[in-house]
Amino acid sequence: MARGSRPVYVISIAASLAGCHPRTLRIYEEEGLVDPVRTDSNIRLYSDEDLQRVRIIRYLTQRRGVNLAGVKMLLQLREAADLLQEIADAIDSEDESSPNEPKNQRMEL
């Protein structure tokens, strides 16, 4: 499940909202493209962020002709880019908080 979003939709409702069949959501889960939360009774629950991800997957597959392996790679690249942006933002805020410190001393990898 995507972080920061509360899971509320059972698979039939989620599929209807995303414009696909419930089996499609199961396939996306099997392929590791979505990860819905499961209840104690093993019912899948989808969040709004999960549904947004499904819409992205459907756009890439149906409109752009990308296969599921390609979609998985693109989503991983998107997540990596988001992480890199967070790191860059953190470095920028560190730079602003200590402007007198030389940059080569602040960033040691």
Label every PLM stretch briefly:
Residues 21-23:
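Short coil turns linking two alpha-helices in DNA-binding domains
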